[in-house]
Curated annotation (Swiss-Prot):
Family named by the database record: Belongs to the FliW family.
Keywords: Bacterial flagellum biogenesis, Chaperone, Cytoplasm, Translation regulation
Gene this chain is encoded by: fliW
Name recorded for this polypeptide: Flagellar assembly factor FliW
InterPro entries recorded: Flagellar_assembly_factor_FliW (IPR003775), Flagellar_assmbl_FliW_dom_sf (IPR024046)
One Pfam entry name: FliW
Covalent S-S links between cysteines: none
Record organism: Thermotoga neapolitana (strain ATCC 49049 / DSM 4359 / NBRC 107923 / NS-E)
Its job: Acts as an anti-CsrA protein, binds CsrA and prevents it from repressing translation of its target genes, one of which is flagellin. Binds to flagellin and participates in the assembly of the flagellum.
Length: 149
């Protein structure tokens, strides 16, 4: 199906659509999202609302930015998605990219988007790990990742 999104008219398939029963913080009223990875922005993907064409969040696999990223999802959140083991989940972190200042981009490692692919459900969780913050400077994290290789 073709949807109007923040990125324009986009063909979206059923396997790209996920339901966030609780919405996501700041957008609790929005429940239906698509996760896409356009060639022109890869490895950055987009979590796009299918209910409000103005809402779209840039996301990335946190392991690309912080190879030692090791989140522990609270058990109550695992229960909400119907899993007992977080290995069944996909993790994405939201990027904030100030207009005209990509060098000031940050990644939110504290509140990842988690997705259970086989049930098409997702949610944003708040981790208790004090090492992860809402705003990590992306350039610093990328330098740190290079030094780990």
């Amino acid at each position: 199906m073709v949807y109007s999104t923040k990125l324009g008219e986009i063909e979206i398939t059923d396997d790209q659509i996920f339901v966030f029963e609780e919405g996501i913080p700041g957008f609790e009223h929005l429940k239906k999202f698509a996760l896409i990875f356009p060639e022109e922005t890869f490895p950055i993907g987009w979590l796009l609302s299918l209910e409000d064409s103005h809402v779209g969040l840039p996301v990335v696999d946190p392991k690309l930015v912080r190879p030692d990223y090791d989140p522990v999802v609270p058990s109550e959140d695992l229960e909400k998605l119907g899993v007992s083991n977080q290995d069944e989940l996909l993790f994405f972190c939201v990027l904030t990219i100030p207009p005209g200042k990509p060098e000031e981009a940050t990644i939110n490692l504290r509140a990842p988007i988690i997705i259970r692919q086989n049930t098409k459900k997702g949610m944003q969780v708040i981790l208790e790990n004090a090492d992860y913050h809402l705003k990590h400077l992306l350039s610093e994290e990328m330098e740190r990742a290079k030094s780990m290789v």
